[in-house]
Amino acid sequence: MGGSRHFAVDDAAQRRRLEAGLDAIGLALTPAQVDTLFAYLTLLRKWNGVYNLTAIRHPDEMLTHHLLDSLTAVPALAEAARSANVAQGARGRVLDVGSGGGMPGMPLAISCPDVSVLMVDIVQKKTAFLTQCRAQLHLTNAAAHWGPVEKIDDEQGYAVITSRAFAELTDFVTLSGHLLAPGGKLIAMKGVYPQAEIDRMEAAGLMADWQVEAVPKLVVPELDVERHLVVLSRR
């Protein structure tokens, strides 16, 4: 396995960078929540050394490219989950499709205890990791599901369905759209402005039923990269 390489970790420095990143994003978390975020990052590092959960192995890059990158989307995801005009049973429910090691679902669940997050992945070792995190971090508002999202049947539906590295917009909408509650939002995390993906949605005929509401730009602390959210809703 590729986990044999060892990296020295300065936990105190990483925690300071995490706290600075949270300040830059505008996420006001309690010290206990910051502790839990850092504990999650530590678990990700440890499990990744054995189970290859992510190709990113350096602790500094795990902090920036995974945790801070995901945390930038948390305010928008939480606001959409709380304010979506959905039925009572779907309110505050978020589905994270292709969650992998838990991004962005785990940071969202830690940051927003009033939001219920289900993280889905087809790789069993990844959902096993997420289930372990839920237990060790005492996250009663988080859960993991192993299997393809298109096979899930949930009558309540979700206020928000999100993905970070799951698929093209066309596949994201096609495979997971049936789980979105009426009035809910699909929110995909993307890099550069995904005009080509939006065009392919149009070419596939999906714009007859779906619309792009907004494509806000995100700024990730410590990363000089382009990041956007694509917010979709049913017409």
Curated annotation (Swiss-Prot):
The keyword rRNA processing applies. Its EC number is 2.1.1.170. It is found in: Cytoplasm. One of its GO terms (cellular component) is cytosol. Transmembrane segments: none annotated. InterPro entries: rRNA_ssu_MeTfrase_G, SAM-dependent_MTases_sf. It catalyses: guanosine(527) in 16S rRNA + S-adenosyl-L-methionine = N(7)-methylguanosine(527) in 16S rRNA + S-adenosyl-L-homocysteine. Keywords: Cytoplasm, Methyltransferase, rRNA processing, S-adenosyl-L-methionine, Transferase. The keyword NADP does not apply. S-adenosyl-L-methionine binds at G98, M103, V149, E150, R164. GO terms for molecular function: rRNA (guanine-N7-)-methyltransferase activity. SUPFAM superfamilies: S-adenosyl-L-methionine-dependent methyltransferases (SSF53335). Belongs to the methyltransferase superfamily. RNA methyltransferase RsmG family. Specifically methylates the N7 position of guanine in position 527 of 16S rRNA. This is Ribosomal RNA small subunit methyltransferase G. The gene is rsmG.
